[in-house]
Amino acid sequence: MDQRDTTQVVRMLTPDERKEMLESINSPADLRKLPVEELPVLARALRDFMVESVSKTGGHLSSSLGATELAIALHYVFNTPEDAIVWDVGHQAYAHKILTGRRDAMATLRQTDGISGFPKRSESPYDAFGTAHSSTSISAALGMAVADSLNGKKDRWHIAVIGDGALTGGMAVEALNHAGVYKKDLKLLIILNDNDHSISPPAGALSGHLAKLVSTAPVWKAREISKSILKPVPLLWDFAKRVEKQTVNFLSPPSTLFSSFDINYFGPIDGHDVTGLVSFLKNLKALDGPIVLHVKTKKGKGYKPAEDDPTLYHGVGKFDPVVGIQPSAAPTKKTYTQLFSDWICDTAERDKTLYAITPAMREGSGLVEFEKRFPERYRDVAIAEQHAVTFAAGLACAGIHPVVAIYSTFAQRAYDQIVHDVAIQDLPVLFAIDRAGLVGADGRTHHGLFDIAFLRSLPNMTVITPSDENEMRLLLNTAWTLQTPVAVRYPRGTGPGVEVTADTETVEIGKSKTVRTTSAPKGKRVAILAFGSMVWRLTEVAEVLDATLVDMRFVKPLDEEAVLKAAAEHDLLVTAEEGIKAGGAGSAVLEFLSEAGQTTRTLIFGIPDVFIDHGDTEVLMTRSGLDPVHIRAKIEAALS
């Protein structure tokens, strides 16, 4: 049975007619030519197109389905791109992309050399600000609004669209605190797209607060009308002000987060009533900002499988839209995330001090099973990476041994806390850093390329890079024995398929493992010092070149004995890592060799000094010079 929604009440058009309507819109200027009563039909056409298109490319589906009417209404009412829209995170921006001239390009969404899955300034003038990480939109829109005010452009609107999940990020609250300073001086509109979801289910007291909000709009409107009537009569106006002070708690609805920042709040209103949205937004344009409009939407709206399971359809691969995502056959290999999940559950059975923390990435970080089995030793702190790390530091001070499960790209957001609250105090916090290295379709904002460089520079920090499935278990066990800060970084997806034979065994801290030893003659002797995934990627190269291959295991402490031995016994050293070359593991090797007075020629392979775009991971590895063919050629050239 076709799972696409047929219940929405819109003017009856055939699928071909809806398609024709959508194809007539190549910009918001075209959109504004439609009669407002046609907009529900357009919403249906957009959803049909999104489901068909994303089912072929993969992408963030359920969030964009939920924000369809919102995207239509914003571009219909506001003069984009002169008026600027900032889409927080960007998961919900596909309708925006389609309406702003990228309908045909959606076939290349997140593909190599295709359009980005997120708003990107270099891609379109309608993408006012690049987003992909959470909670940045209000700060960015506020900055633009202040700049325009300084430049005399006081008629330009700046709109931040932020979800209820993203509003739990501290940066968003900081921006609200700042925005309230401007009272009514700026044309700043904050749309709270409230769909009761982030990626994982919502967490924290703020989510509960949003769920209970009632509208202050009627009271606010009544107050403004009363002002206009009473102010011309001084005696009545003075009396009204005295009465207001005594009755405000009686007449006003419960205080909201926004009113506490002196920001006018309206809502909640139905985010799927597109004609109502248009009318409301037109009225708001007559006011000065900052203004918050609270819009209630349903994540996955219009496609029943996504409505029923918005988390499953948050980020999807290719699927059949007629039947929806179907259970796949049991995988032959476990992902590194699944291996981490197995390890943390097994370890928690043995060690009652283990406490798991995630900043709103329960599913992605592999903690679903842990939460089921150990709910009292688990906390999703919402989109609050900084708090997650310092919360872990506090636990560690009081005899609990915390594990912070976090993506590499999101660990960047908590760097000061890692330095100030964990490393300086030498606290036993284990960072399980998922998505380390190139992640593919999510692109430059989500690759985990900087963690080696920014972690190895910290005193007291141990940095570990498992190379395969069994090493993952061994090195997590080893990390758990430390009573100091430690980070274990591992890539997205699966490894080479090595059987996991380790149970509770550990390895010596700072000791590497020699995978093979060269028998090449002097002058042709190469030692490859590989970190993490580069070990199995270069196994065949080492065999073809008859090179020594060392699984370094530890970036810090570096196995200095192994490095000295390799330098003394080989004509060429090669380091390889799936991370930024500047300041990375190869740099650590060269720093040590320099201090030791060793001058053996060394080639460093890592990610070059550029931000890597989205695309197929293997293509990106090749473009970064990390594919076996390129590395082998460079080694052979160095030996010749």
Predicted feature locations:
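N-terminal amphipathic, basic-rich helices that act as targeting or association modules
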Residues: 2-99, 257-263, 268-277, 291-294
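Cofactor-binding active-site loop characterized by glycine-rich and histidine/acidic residues
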Residues: 18, 60-182, 354, 358-359, ...
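Nucleotide/pyrophosphate-binding catalytic subdomain
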Residues: 49, 73, 323-330, 334
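Thiamine diphosphate
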Residues: 102, 108-140, 150-155, 182-312, ...
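Extended, hydrophobic alpha-helical segments in both membrane/secreted and soluble proteins
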Residues: 158, 162-175, 179, 366, ...
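Helix-enriched interaction subdomains in cytosolic or periplasmic regions
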Residues: 318-322, 456-501
